[in-house]
Structures are given as structure tokens and as C-alpha cells.
Swiss-Prot record:
It comes from the Archaea. This is Rubredoxin. It holds the Pfam family Rubredoxin. PANTHER family: RUBREDOXIN, RUBREDOXIN-1-RELATED. It comes from Pyrococcus abyssi (strain GE5 / Orsay). PROSITE patterns: RUBREDOXIN, RUBREDOXIN_LIKE. The gene is rub. Rubredoxin is a small nonheme, iron protein lacking acid-labile sulfide. Its single Fe, chelated to 4 Cys, functions as an electron acceptor and may also stabilize the conformation of the molecule. GO terms for molecular function: electron transfer activity; iron ion binding. Residues 1-52 form the Rubredoxin-like domain. Keywords: Electron transport, Iron, Metal-binding, Transport.
């Protein structure tokens, strides 16, 4: 699964881990995150994330 980096603060969203503190189950693909999901560290929207290898 992919990892996505916040271009603002560097937070890594790992699809394997999800974001359990914010109700996102492990295995949730980035494109399947709710539209109102934001970076848990800085509050940046999904549009500020880039896929990394």
C-alpha cells in the first residue's frame, strides 16, 4: 500500500496503518479518506498531500 506525505508539515499517512486516532481504519486507501479528513498534525487538506514511494 502507498504512503502520502503532507507538503506542509511532513506528516506521513501510511495506508497500512490508517489514522486510528481519527477513526480511519488500517488499510484505508488515501483516495477513500473522507473529503473532510485533514492532516492530524497541521490541519492541511488532502490536496496538500503527495504520494511517496
Amino acid at each position: 500500500m502507498a504512503k502520502w506525505r503532507c507538503k506542509i508539515c511532513g506528516y506521513i499517512y501510511d495506508e497500512d496503518e490508517g489514522d486510528p486516532d481519527n477513526g480511519i481504519s488500517p488499510g484505508t486507501k488515501f483516495e477513500d479518506l473522507p473529503d473532510d479528513w485533514v492532516c492530524p498534525l497541521c490541519g492541511a487538506p488532502k490536496s496538500e498531500f503527495e504520494r511517496i514511494e
